[in-house]
Amino acid sequence: MSDLLTKDEIVALEKSYWDAMKEKDGARTAALSGETSIVSGPRGVMSIDQAKMGKMTEEGNWTLQDYAFDDVQVSTPAPGVAIIAYKVKQTVTMDGQQKQMEAADMSTWLRGKDGWQCHAHSETMLGGQPLV
């Protein structure tokens, strides 16, 4: 992949990350994450290093069964920078309970010595869903 990605390439990167979560593939989520990534969502804001990201993927008390993107928006403001925002419908099991959730997500990808990696991700729950 070059320093300027097409919309399809950016979507493919993001889906690769989601597929790794679905497969509980911590090595892949770690490799696709920046050395330290900033994540924001219903539980607040945190910085997560690659090792912790991999561990959270493998050991988290959740399972992602399915997901679908909608209303995808992308921007490549500079060489080696890609931003993607989208709505995502996801089916997850948390604490033994299956849930359907809809959120608005955004990720910032940077191309570095290890290829394209996600350095920031945010998730906002939609539809007045409980912040569990």
Summary of predicted features, one role per range:
Residues M1-A31, I38-V132:
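A beta-strand edge to alpha-helix "cap/lid" segment located at domain peripheries
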